[in-house]
Amino acid sequence: MSVLWPCKNSASFSWTAPADRSHWTGPKAGRADVTGGGVACQTAAMEDAAARALGRVAANGIELAYETFGEAGGPPVVLVMGLATQMIAWPDELCEGLARCGLFVVRFDNRDAGESTHLRDLPAPRLADIVVRRRPPPYSISDMAGDVAGLIDGLGLGQVHLVGASMGGFIAQVVALEHPGRVRTLTLIMTSTGSRRVGQPKPRVYARLLRPPVAADRSAAMAAAVETFRLIGSPGFAFDEAYVRDLAGRSWDRGYDPAGRRRQLAASAGQPDRTAELRHLAVPALVIHGLHDPLVAPSGGLAVARAIPGSRFVGFSGMGHDLPRALWPEFVDEIAALTAAGGQRRRRDRPAG
């Protein structure tokens, strides 16, 4: 689809996919109301910090480290991060903003990342094997989706509002497909369907993805992160080098694992095309994508939105493959609006009595 429908915010574009996916319609006028469905969004009230707690939970045969924001009685939101990226890459301010909307926010480290279980007994695939898919990966995106389902069950969350970024978006899609009873709404950020015909990276970025520098120490890890995010980040927004350095340093302290990264990369490279399955997904869905993403081209997000019936696509001009600070309030508003709408839909669909 080549037609762009401008939102009220001139920096973004929005499409809504009807249930039959036969055509696209323009966005509703104005900003979505984020006060409905029992979710009272108070992103302007920044005085009181959201309650936070750290923990570990057994899930799918491993242990996952997690952190929560907000009160446990609120609608649960689970945030799934991407390749070789730890839960702290979900900015504290974004998590706290969602919590101030009355949501109970859970971020966690995937397997082979941060403080969760590192599967060092499994082989770390060679680059050549990953590229040509010569051998099955040590584990799959489906296995990682099973981790998320185990986290949801282990924390007693029931149905959650699931948010996935990059590879986390792959994982979130598979959770919704393979564990549908655990997902109330689905938000997918800078991700794709698994098809090799859409969402492909630029050659220079692909080379960096396959051969990232192996850091010898904390300082080198920070420098490498700056180099990477200058390559894949958002050209339309100021580059926050101090933030990137701080995040990379804290990630080094929590657990740097190049072999784990290769195992995750193999899982990502080995995933199938989910387009046909996504066409049968019956869950309120939002797809957010940077219109200048050099790692997962916008065609990937558009393909996801076109496949999921009734989904909404929001594309931000100037956004690359990161979460620019200037857009954090936009992300909070969009996610909170979807959770409110999803909660209302769930109450309407619930049988009487």
Regions from the language model: what does each represent?
Residues 281, 287-289:
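Short beta-strand/loop motif that positions the catalytic acidic residue
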Residues 1-25, 31:
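Low-acidity, Ser/Thr- and Arg-rich intrinsically disordered low-complexity segments
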Residues 62-131:
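Conserved HGGG/HGGXW glycine-rich cap/lid loop of the alpha/beta-hydrolase fold
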Residues 311-353:
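Catalytic active-site module of serine/aspartate enzymes centered on a nucleophile-bearing elbow/loop
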Residues 292-296:
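Acidic catalytic loop of the alpha/beta-hydrolase fold
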Residues 201-276, 283, 303:
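Alpha/beta-hydrolase
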Residues 177, 185-216:
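Flexible "cap/lid" loop of the alpha/beta hydrolase fold
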Residues 142-160:
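Conserved acidic catalytic loop of the alpha/beta-hydrolase fold
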